[in-house]
Amino acid sequence: MKLFLDFLPIILFFLTFKVAEGRAEEAAAFATEHLGALVSGGVVGAAEAPVLLATVVVILATLAQVLYLKLRGQKVDTMLWVSLGLVTVMGGATIWFHSETFIKWKPSVLYWVMSAAFLLAPIVAGKDLLRAMLGGQIELPAFAWKKLNLAWAAFFAGMGVLNIWVAYNFSTSTWATFKAFGGMGLMFVFMLAQGLYMHRHMKVDGIKADES
């Protein structure tokens, strides 16, 4: 359920963009009527309408995700708060300035913030971030936690670079597709590799899984 909620804003962004892209003139008229007060000049063009509408949806979806967790009395992860702040500020800039550049940079900034968190946690808090998150559920040797922590830092740093590369070398439509499915697919593959590595070094009753 949590994983679904995490990816829901991205999926809704993609769906909104694609629907609006297929009906650009109608989307522009709708955006001008309903978002005119939020954009510089008050008029939304057909070329920019899809990404502006998708941006509004992703802001609202992320806010709804936070409110849902709060109403259920569940903890809102720090990174979700960061994501909400980034999408609100950068998404707001995209809407006001009619510029897709800001929302395209948002995933990269978030990825780099997460990469920095994994790198700085051992220095600031004296423990690997992943170990702090999963240490109570999984027992691994210290060296394994360290490697996993560095792997996550490298993965997020690389994803940030990849997102910008796609954003500046391909169309907005291609970028939106990559954002929804490319990033998600790479995340699943990486998590699978992490799971296999964890299983290899996992301790069961004090014995490593690969030695049992």
Swiss-Prot record:
Keyword check for Transmembrane helix: yes
Its transmembrane ranges are 49-69, 78-98, 105-125, 150-170, 178-198
Pfam families, A to Z: IspA
Q: Which keywords are on file for this protein?
A: Cell inner membrane, Cell membrane, Membrane, Transmembrane, Transmembrane helix
Task: Using the UniProt record, give the first listed, main subcellular location.
Answer: membrane
Q: Where in the cell is it found?
A: Cell inner membrane
Q: What does this protein do?
A: Plays a role in cell envelope biogenesis, maintenance of cell envelope integrity and membrane homeostasis.
Family affiliation: Belongs to the YciB family.
| UniProt protein name | Inner membrane-spanning protein YciB
Which species is this UniProt entry from?
Answer: Leptothrix cholodnii (strain ATCC 51168 / LMG 8142 / SP-6) (Leptothrix discophora (strain SP-6))
Q: Which gene encodes it?
A: yciB
